[in-house]
Amino acid sequence: MSVQGIEGVLQQLQVTALQASGSAKTLPAEAGFASELKAAIGKISENQQVARTSAQNFELGVPGVGLNDVMVNAQKSSVSLQLGIQVRNKLVAAYQEVMNMGV
């Protein structure tokens, strides 16, 4: 597992998060790995909160909230969470590989 592979997965996570938010923010030119990971986790949390809120609004009968919106938000949340889990798995595997290297 190479660092470039991990960075590629992290970039895919960032692109997915930006597309899900619908915003055209520019990424900082030089950001640290920890800050990028924290931002990605924050975006996953935000997606889950949006899905939870839309589901609650649908249950309460708030006008303008359709079942299709609830289902789309739930799927966005699910996909972003699964992607986050896969990134975590790759990071753990890379860490274990580095720890098993001989000195």
Curated annotation (Swiss-Prot):
InterPro entries: FliE. The lineage of its organism: Bacteria, Pseudomonadati, Pseudomonadota, Gammaproteobacteria, Enterobacterales. The keyword Lipid metabolism does not apply. HAMAP family: FliE (MF_00724). It is found in: Bacterial flagellum basal body. Pfam families: FliE. Its main location: other. Keywords: Bacterial flagellum. GO terms for cellular component: bacterial-type flagellum basal body. Belongs to the FliE family. GO terms for biological process: bacterial-type flagellum assembly; bacterial-type flagellum-dependent cell motility. GO terms for molecular function: cytoskeletal motor activity; structural molecule activity. This is Flagellar hook-basal body complex protein FliE.
